[in-house]
Amino acid sequence: MTNIHPTAIIEPGAKIGKNVVIEPYVVIKSTVTLCDDVVVKSYAYIDGYTTVGRGTTIWPSAMIGNKPQDLKYQGEKTYVTIGEKCEIREFAIITSSTFEGTTVSIGNNCLIMPWAHVAHNCVIGSHVVLSNHAQLAGHVVVEDYAIIGGMVGVHQFVRIGAHAMVGALSGVRRDIPPYTIGTGNPYQLGGINKVGLQRRQVPFETRLALIKVFKKVYRSEDSFSEALLEAQEEYGHIPEVQNFIHFCQNPSKRGIERGATKDAFQEESVDKEGALIES
């Protein structure tokens, strides 16, 4: 049963699904769609052509679907789509897109923490975490299972690969390859996200191959492109390695991040459970 508090403002035309809860002082504009089992907590504001997927919770004072912070926007019809079972926490801002017919999209099972900002034309995959005050500029792409730490700033048009983990307070100006971990401003890669991949039950052999490929590519005396081709020949049969190589071979206009710390090249050993540990 849908439960709408009498102080909430729901404009005529808004589409409200089954078992939706809308708390006091919420504002829902006329072109919004809330799917079944959505919860919108007090003072949240949802505008524009926004669709909120089933089971998602919008926390107090979040603002979704409002006019993009882009001077090029001239009132075109644009969209926001949020997937299922997401958590959009307090004071998060997800603006609408720029250019007719384009969409800001967020996948399923994402956690957007307080004060995070998702700008126009961003595309976020599923199972992504944006930590407190993470700021995504326009046209940023964040792939599945990536984690972006607190107070990170991401330059427009940057891509962040799947399963990457971006450390807090980082400034990200170039594409971050999938499966990597790093931090800093300027940003430096720290190698493969070994702990994250192990937690997600990526096979040991795959994790080890990714580590070897990262080292081959990032400390090779050959050119970056040549090192990628060599890695392709040796490890390209592994899907995750293929994904890493393809990502690096097809950068955005920002280019691939090339900086890496010395720790990224430490030798690896294996503990008795088969987990990778640093020597």
Curated annotation (Swiss-Prot):
It is an enzyme of class 2 (transferase). One of its GO terms (molecular function) is acyl-[acyl-carrier-protein]-UDP-N-acetylglucosamine O-acyltransferase activity. One of its GO terms (cellular component) is membrane. Residues 258-279 are annotated as: Disordered. The keyword Magnesium does not apply. CDD domains: LbH_UDP-GlcNAc_AT (cd03351). Involved in the biosynthesis of lipid A, a phosphorylated glycolipid that anchors the lipopolysaccharide to the outer membrane of the cell. NCBIfam families: lipid_A_lpxA (TIGR01852), PRK05289.1 (NF003657). Homotrimer. This is Acyl-[acyl-carrier-protein]--UDP-N-acetylglucosamine O-acyltransferase.
